[in-house]
């Protein structure tokens, strides 16, 4: 692409345009600034523009990304760091299944996303797409596509979740009965 210098990866990338400064920044890069080796898509930006959540097939955005799956990441544009969000509370990467469709809270602390990974939260045995929220301050991941008693959904919960500005509420689509 010709949006930023040095973009030679021949992949779909994520960009942020600052309308005040008229600058365009590529977001789908590693903490070291290396371009993604794989397509990136599905974006969400925090209220002040500091944090951008996105999905990517790239395995070179963070160290240890060996699951061969689409993951969700957050790029901090102030500190130039990239963090993988689609991990369990213990830091384990999602198994070989896809995580995507991020929605980030206003302050960038919480990221809701869809995933069919079965190892991001305890008791995930429904073999269905679920909705999760990652708290980047406490480094915890919670499955939110459950009923009021905490029972898992009996069908897929997917598409693009939407998290409230304060991170308290998450709206999502589900085929659960």
Identify the function of each model-found stretch.
Residues 1-177:
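Conserved "turn/edge" positions that cap or connect secondary-structure elements
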